[in-house]
Swiss-Prot record, chain A:
Belongs to the cation transport ATPase (P-type) (TC 3.A.3) family. Type IV subfamily. It is a multi-pass membrane protein. Disruption phenotype: Results in abnormal formation of intestinal vacuoles. It is found in: Cell membrane; Early endosome membrane; Recycling endosome membrane. The active site is at D388 (4-aspartylphosphate intermediate). The chain crosses the membrane at residues 78-98, 276-296, 318-338, 831-851, 855-875, 901-921, 935-955, 972-992, 1013-1033. Keywords: ATP-binding, Cell membrane, Endosome, Magnesium, Membrane, Metal-binding, Nucleotide-binding, Translocase, Transmembrane, Transmembrane helix. GO terms for biological process: endocytosis; lysosome organization; negative regulation of phagocytosis, engulfment; phospholipid translocation; phospholipid transport; positive regulation of phagocytosis, engulfment. This is Phospholipid-transporting ATPase tat-1. The gene is tat-1.
Swiss-Prot record, chain B:
Belongs to the CDC50/LEM3 family. It is found in: Cell membrane; Early endosome membrane; Recycling endosome membrane; Endoplasmic reticulum. Disruption phenotype: RNAi-mediated knockdown results in the appearance of abnormal vacuoles in the intestines and defective recycling of endocytic cargo with the accumulation of cargo within abnormal early endosomes. InterPro entries: CDC50/LEM3_fam (IPR005045). It comes from Caenorhabditis elegans. GO terms for cellular component: early endosome membrane; endoplasmic reticulum; Golgi apparatus; plasma membrane; recycling endosome membrane. The gene is chat-1. Its main location: membrane. It comes from the Eukaryota. This is CDC50 family protein chat-1. Keywords: Cell membrane, Endoplasmic reticulum, Endosome, Membrane, Transmembrane, Transmembrane helix. The lineage of its organism: Eukaryota, Metazoa, Ecdysozoa, Nematoda, Chromadorea. The keyword Membrane applies. The keyword Iron-sulfur does not apply. The chain crosses the membrane at residues 53-73, 309-329.
Length: 1139, 348
């Protein structure tokens, strides 16, 4: 044993030597995990740090501080500080709320139950109570709570199947095997007698490497990754395992690999920041201009204006003080409440997402969860979707669907599983064809590595390959049921009679061979047969020559094409009768190859090649990799919304292409551009060639898709090739990336993000997708069945893939439209009000005097116009949900309504025009000052309060005008805001002199203002006259160049017939383009099937392409080799209970 | 042998659904289907098509035009007479000819031009607490807070108070017969109630007279009289001056014609010649200011200002014109769109 003093290895005492009071030498972290951002102490500093990382908060803090300098602030000392504090506290409340939610979900995980060995008994405890050195028991289908050393299992020789799709995305089951010295401890009694010392490496992120020693009775044994069960993986097809806890909580490899979710900010936030910086410079410029004006005025008028002569030697009269004064005066050009309004709006938008009943999955009783709310509008800007395959697009459930034997094509596509009574009927005919049927069924039942298990009278098939299990189940459903496996033989029930078949040899599947063979001796006849199943290409070239086989291949190809068009995975079955002599010649050679050390793989392949020839084709099978619900429809809709969909998978290319077809990512007449080169030069050339091809295809308006594997991708992402790859990637509407490692997925996401400033959405379900989800602009996790890993790293979690359609098309498009409106509107209203100060400065000697009362200025954003943007952000529906779901092209058109510089300038321009109109109309109305029949004049605040009232009214009506759907909250908020101001003015007018000196200027102003008829008539006139131009321009555009949204709304309102709708659309070419998308998606959804096409067309288009995935998801380099696995299994043996 | 990897089917769920109690328990995460949560509130989608915008524009026109007419008539009915006296040497006499009778209440104003009563530092230099009687409270009044010589607080403090307008006017009617009658004026109704009730109060008298109450204060440097001699803080001219104007060209109510004392003026000011005598004290020439005396009546809409009425009329008419334009555009576009669709049909 290494000395404990020096190394940083982990030393763990197991079993009896572990005194409950005796601590480990090292302190290990607890198994409790926390993803919270704050705790009680860290809240304030962290929160403030987060807040003051934003420019605008620093800005307002500075303003609040500057206001403390006497005689500089035109608006008093607290008019920024108070609203700013209000706004910060709203943000703080939101942060606290969100952190509490995180804590709840952590607690849920921490409270999962697990059985821990205490004093020889299994005691149920919670995950968080698991500590290093504990013995725990995990039952089938349970998750491992920590990284464990596998000690024993219910299976022979301590084998255990685990599913690691959460960790690495590989869908096949992995086989782990306990060390032989521990695998016998299959009862708690034995385990509690067990004692040992473990030394292993310190916690690390490496998932595929692990080394340690276990010392039992002074004998040290090495153990590695084959004995390590990782947190996040799941036990499958194994009744139970015992494990010793090695790494807990944040030390476990899963959590070591999960980065803290990066703080993502949406593109809108970034753009808003730029706009704010722009406004800041405008503000500085205005302050400089105004201060210059002030200097000039002073030069001309002081000391001549004797009533102001006291300012002649005023120290605060210098230019710089003037700049400061105006800086404070105009500071509100930057909307103080924008951030918090957006936060509030997004918070509630997230609640909409969480509460959407149409994104609620009854089966798993879960809804969509918006885990971050600041990306809501990003959902409406998605240009790329990167989707994981297994668990996301597919359910990882294989179903045996079709069977081709000779000229007959059995089964149909409608049934959930193979169901065709004619198969059995044909078998009963007893002719040559029925022999083929029998052979195929037998092969399905025999040629595999599946282990049967009898559990409670039901047969359960355990397999590392779900495809094989599906075939065996399929055979069983057709009365050839495989039920017992012993080391040298299998027993099948063939049409009611048990038949023992001796397994002579197994030639393993490898990805080079693309086939697997078994050599059997048929129990009944004693014949030796070679059964080979594999990809059509490898089987066809190993068939007997002759007309008979050619004909069989012809039939088979036709059937395979049929299967492939539905995206089924296909396998060909062939066989050959061997003579005793032939076999006995071959067998020793093969044995030798198995035992060879050098060049073993090649020797084995060569040996296999000698036997696997002159075979006869007996049939082909089709397996459906069951898709999640509504996957093709969803993908079609997303592609119609002009989103590029990428499928990233760890699977083989054939499988991946297969799924791409079945989930409508590509169609049978989509040209596949397959990049599968191994060297950089070849990849480069291929890419270059494909870019040219893509351009050509674009011209011909033909569909194409890129298929690239992990290795080529490595080259494609380096150096010069990157450019071509990017070019191609942007042109392809569908891309399939196969054989990807989790890290590569993240790299691809990042690469695409860098290619162009497009929003990339990544969607996945497992821990292997976490990196990709975190790298994407928006990460979506599927939370359905287990929903721990991907969902907890994601920004949005949805229970079903097809909810993505609603999440993007409805929530995304709406939220984007709303948030943009909220932002633009916030800028608008602030500029509209506060730029009036500039106009007034011209009439107030550039002294920095405000036209409005100071607190009304401060409360503009916090009270009087706080609600219109909020309701715009929450209740505006640019287009009905049903409609955008039906016409996904609208989604693309909404992206154009984006937050562009043009749009921003338009709003700013409008704000300036409005403020000019409001100020000068008020000025002209009030210039004469006498607006009562009592002949009095109102003074300074009469002008200010009137102008303010007109601004509030205009701004609130503008919100209504911009709102695309008026619901009662919108109307109430907009009208109510005006009312709120009226109420405020009344109350504020009554304050003086009751509370200190507050409100002296305002005293009685409400009664004064409201007793003027002229005021009320101006209130009707000025806002309406200001907004009339908006109304006119808007309607001109709607009539002349309606946007797709407007067309859709009009269509919806049936103001035009469908014909008129198209006619309207044809008016502008831009609209036409959108309409083309819109109507094509409409047609697409009505005609539906693009699968109906002739076989010849397909074969023409796909001449050189490998389309049929062959059904093998076999783990090639597992702890236990396939042959060994078969040889070691005896399904008749009684299993220990582990209790 | 059933497949063991079957996903939960709908039958299972509906089976649960049959049992009411269990449904609630099992489907505890089901969102509530309220219209608010599901964003399904009844909504009206305003879309500015010809069919909605044309009536809107016409309605605006139909409302604005009559209002404009009423306002214009109201303003037109107001009589106003202005006379400038900036350079008139004190005591100066000006002859005024009112071409027609000023019926009803007649208001007498003074106008100041190019006078920045809205300068920030000027506006700020006041203390409303002092004007309520708290004589020592001179915060914010700098530099007119404490008299440097006597160290006593200035009352009323501040730059506004210091620069109070101090011209006085007398208006007399000269009949054709040559009889000159003083026009009786009153300060009743010259200030807002709020100023009288809540903003300007003299300090408590404590059995003495007002000047005793002001004893420990100094008058503002520009004032010729002690404030206590002219009514203290409740001085009407002072209160009017303290309501600072919003714009550098402003009007302040000086007096209202008293229609109760002399039957000649019971109906306002009759047509004819008047003599305005001004005690011209207030210097404005130095900064290019201008002083005017204004005689005016009012209507329900206030003084003479036809702007709003004309604006209503203009915008109202524009709205009608726009409505017509929209109809034309609508018809024209409908036509051209038909043609366009014909073209596209030919192409197909």
């Amino acid at each position: 044993m290494p000395t404990e003093a020096r190394d940083n290895n982990r030393h763990i005492h197991l079993g009896k030597v572990r005194d409950p009071h005796h601590q480990h030498a090292q302190r290990f972290c607890s198994n409790r995990i926390s993803t919270c951002k704050y705790n009680g102490f860290s809240f304030l500093p962290r929160f403030l740090y987060e807040q003051f990382r934003r420019y605008n908060n620093i800005f307002f803090l500075a303003i609040a501080l500057l206001q403390q300098i006497p005689d500089v602030s035109p608006t008093g000392r607290y008019t920024t500080a108070v609203p700013f504090l209000i706004i910060l506290s709203v943000s703080a409340l939101k942060e606290i709320f969100e952190d509490v939610k995180r804590r709840r979900s952590d607690n849920k995980v921490n409270a999962f139950s697990v059985e821990i060995l205490v004093d020889g008994h299994w005691i149920e405890k919670q995950w968080k109570d698991v500590s290093v050195g504990d013995f725990i028991r995990i039952d089938n289908d349970s998750l491992f709570p920590a990284d464990l050393l596998l000690l024993a299992s219910s299976e022979q020789q301590g084998m255990a199947y685990i599913e690691t799709s959460n960790l690495d995305g590989e869908t096949n089951l992995k086989i782990k095997q306990a060390l032989d010295i521990t695998s016998t401890m299959t009862s708690p009694e034995k385990l509690s007698q067990f004692e040992s010392e473990i030394t292993c490496e310190p916690p690390s992120r490496h998932v595929n490497e692990f080394n340690g020693n276990i010392e039992i009775n002074g004998v040290a044994r090495h153990f590695g990754i084959d004995q390590l069960l990782l947190r996040g993986a799941r036990l499958k097809n194994t009744a139970w395992i015992f494990g010793a806890v090695i790494y807990t909580g944040h030390d476990s490899k899963l959590l070591m690999n999960s980065k803290r979710a990066p703080l993502k900010s949406g593109t809108i936030d970034v753009q808003t920041n730029y706009r704010i910086i722009f406004l800041f410079f405008v503000l500085v410029a205005l302050a400089l201009i105004s201060a210059t004006g002030s200097e000039i005025w002073r030069g001309n008028n002081i000391p001549q204006a004797w009533y102001l002569s006291f300012l002649e030697h005023d120290p605060k009269g210098s230019f710089l003080w003037g700049v400061l004064t105006f800086f404070i005066l105009y500071n509100n050009l930057i909307p103080i409440s924008l951030q918090v309004t957006l936060e509030v709006v997004r918070f509630f938008q997230a609640i909409y997402i969480n509460n959407d009943i149409e994104m609620y999955d009854v089966n798993s009783d879960s809804c969509a969860i918006a885990r971050t709310s600041n990306l809501n509008e990003e959902l409406g800007q998605v240009k790329f979707i990167m989707s994981d395959k297994t668990g996301t697009l597919t359910r990882n459930v294989m179903k045996f669907k079709r069977l081709s034997i000779g000229s007959r094509n059995y089964g149909n596509n409608e049934d959930d599983e193979f169901a065709d009574a004619s198969l059995i009927e044909d078998y009963r005919q007893g002719d040559e064809h029925s022999t083929s049927i029998l052979e195929v069924l037998k092969m399905m039942a025999v040629c595999h590595t599946v282990v049967p298990e009898n559990k409670d009278g039901q047969l359960i098939y355990q397999s590392s390959s779900p495809d094989e299990a599906a075939l065996v189940r399929g055979a069983a459903s057709q009365s050839v049921s495989f039920h017992t496996r012993q080391p040298q033989k299998v027993i099948c029930n063939v049409f009611g009679e048990d038949e023992t078949i001796e397994i002579l040899d197994v030639i393993d599947f490898t990805s080079d061979r693309k086939r697997m063979s078994v050599i059997v001796r048929d129990g009944a006849g004693g014949d030796i047969k070679l059964y080979t199943k594999g990809a059509d290409t490898v089987i066809f070239e190993r068939l007997e020559h002759g007309k008979e086989q050619e004909e069989a291949v012809e039939y088979c190809t036709e059937h395979l094409e049929d299967y492939a068009s539905f995206g089924y995975r296909t396998l060909c079955f062939s066989m050959r009768h061997l003579t005793e002599q032939e076999y006995s010649q071959w067998a020793p050679e093969y044995k030798k190859a198995i035992l060879a050390i050098d060049n073993r793989a090649k020797l084995l392949a060569d040996a296999a090649e000698k036997l696997e020839r002159n075979m006869i084709l007996v049939g082909a099978t089709a397996i459906e990799d069951k898709l999640q619900e509504w996957v093709p429809e969803t993908i079609q809709a997303l592609m119609a919304a002009d989103i590029r969909v990428w499928m990233l998978t760890g699977d083989k290319r054939e499988t991946a292409i297969n799924i791409a077809h079945s989930c409508a990512l590509c169609h049978t007449n989509t040209e596949l551009l397959i990049v599968d080169k191994t060297t950089y030069e070849e990849t480069y050339q291929k890419l270059e060639q494909f870019v040219a091809r893509a351009i050509e295809l674009e011209k011909q308006e033909k569909g194409f898709a890129m298929v690239i594997d992990g290795k080529s991708l490595l080259h494609a992402l380096t150096g010069e090739a990157r450019k071509h790859f990017g070019d191609l990637a942007l042109r392809c509407h569908a891309v399939v990336c196969c054989r990807m490692s989790p890290m590569q997925k993240a790299e691809v996401v990042e690469m695409v993000r860098k290619l162009a400033k497009h929003v990339v959405l990544a969607i996945g379900d497992g821990a292997n997708d976490v990196a990709m989800i975190q790298a994407a602009n928006v990460g979506v996790g599927i939370s359905g069945e287990e929903g721990l890993q991907a969902a907890s790293a994601s920004d949005y979690a949805i229970p079903r893939f097809h909810f993505l359609r609603r999440l993007l098309l409805v929530h995304g498009a709406w939220n984007h439209d709303r948030s943009v409106k909220v932002i633009l509107y916030s800028f608008y209203k602030n500029i509209c009000l506060y730029i009036i100060e500039l106009w007034f400065a011209m009439f107030s000697a550039w002294s920095g005097q405000t036209i409005f009362e100071r607190w009304t200025i401060g409360m503009f954003n916090v009270i009087f116009t706080a609600w219109p943007p909020v309701v715009l952000g929450l209740f505006d529906h640019p287009v009905p949900a049903e409609q955008i779901m039906k016409y996904p092209a609208l989604y693309a058109s909404f992206q154009n309504r984006a937050f562009s510089i043009g749009n921003f300038s338009l709003w700013i321009g409008l704000a300036i025009v409005h403020s000019l109109s409001l100020f000068f109309l008020t000025y002209a109305t009030m210039e004469h000052q006498v607006v009562w029949d009592n002949g009095l004049t109102g003074g300074w605040l009469m002008l200010g309060n009137c102008a303010y009232t007109f601004v509030v009214a205009t701004v609130c009506f503008k919100a209504l005008l911009e709102c695309d759907s008026w619901t009662w909250p919108v109307v109430v908020a907009c009208i109510g805001s005006i009312g709120l101001w009226i109420v405020f003015v009344i109350v504020y007018s009554l304050v003086f002199p009751h509370i200190g000196g507050i409100g002296a200027d305002m005293a009685g102003m409400a009664a004064i203002m409201m007793s003027s008829y002229t005021f009320w008539l101006a209130l009707l006139f000025i806002p309406l006259a200001t907004l009339l131009w908006d109304l006119v321009i808007k309607s001109l555009f709607t009539i002349a160049m309606p946007t797709p949204r407007e067309l859709a709304v009009m269509y919806n309102k049936r103001t035009t017939s469908f014909n008129g709708f198209e006619r309207l659309a044809s008016y502008s070419s831009n609209v036409l383009e959108n309409m083309r998308l819109l109507t094509s998606s409409l047609r697409g959804s009505t005609t539906g099937s693009t699968r109906s096409r002739t076989a010849s067309e397909a074969s023409l288009a796909l001449a050189e392409q490998t389309r049929y995935g062959f059904a093998f998801s076999q783990d090639e380099s597992s702890a236990v080799a396939q042959t060994e696995l078969i040889r070691n299994v005896d399904s008749t043996r009684e299993k220990p209970t582990g209790r | 042998m059933p497949p063991r990897d079957a996903v939960p089917t709908s039958t299972q769920v509906s089976g649960i659904g049959a049992d009411g109690v269990q449904t609630e328990k099992v489907l505890k995460n089901r969102p509530k289907a309220s219209a608010l949560r599901q964003q399904k509130l009844p909504a009206w989608q305003p879309i500015l098509t010809a069919t909605t915008v044309i009536p809107t524009v016409f309605v605006i026109g139909a409302i604005f035009l009559p209002i404009g007419v009423f306002l214009f008539i109201a303003s037109d009915a107001v009589s106003e007479f202005t006379v400038e006296y900036t350079n008139c040497l004190s005591p100066c006499q000006l002859q005024i000819n009112l071409p027609n009778a000023f019926d009803g209440d007649v208001f007498l104003y003074y106008n100041l031009e190019n006078y920045y009563q809205n300068h920030r530092r000027y506006v700020k230099s006041r203390n409303d607490q002092q004007y309520l009687g708290d004589l020592t409270n001179v915060k914010d009044c700098a530099p007119f807070d404490i008299d440097p010589a006597t160290k006593k607080p200035i009352a009323p403090c501040g730059a506004i108070a210091n620069s109070i307008f101090n011209d006085t006017f007398t208006l007399a009617h000269r009949a054709d017969t040559g009889i000159v009658t003083m026009v009786p004026v009153t300060t009743q109704g010259v200030i807002w109630n709020v100023d009288k009730d809540r903003k300007f109060k003299n300090p408590p008298l404590n059995d003495g007279n007002l000047c005793d109450a002001f004893n420990n204060t100094t008058k503002p440097p520009n004032w010729s009289k002690n404030p206590c001699e002219v009514g203290g803080f409740e001085n009407v001219d002072f209160i009017v001056w303290m309501r600072t104007a919003a714009l550098p060209y402003f009007k302040k109510l000086w007096r209202i014609v008293d229609r109760t004392t002399n039957p000649l003026f019971s109906n306002g000011l009759p047509q004819g010649t008047y003599i305005l005598t001004v005690e011209n004290n207030y210097p404005v020439q130095s900064f290019g200011g201008k002083k005017e005396f204004v005689i005016s009546t009012t209507s329900w809409a206030g003084g003479k200002n036809s702007f709003l009425g004309i604006a209503y009329l203009v915008v109202g008419s524009l709205a009608i014109v726009l409505g017509v334009v929209f109809i034309v555009i609508h018809m024209k576009f409908g036509h051209s769109m038909n043609e366009l669709s014909n073209v596209s049909e030919i192409h197909h």
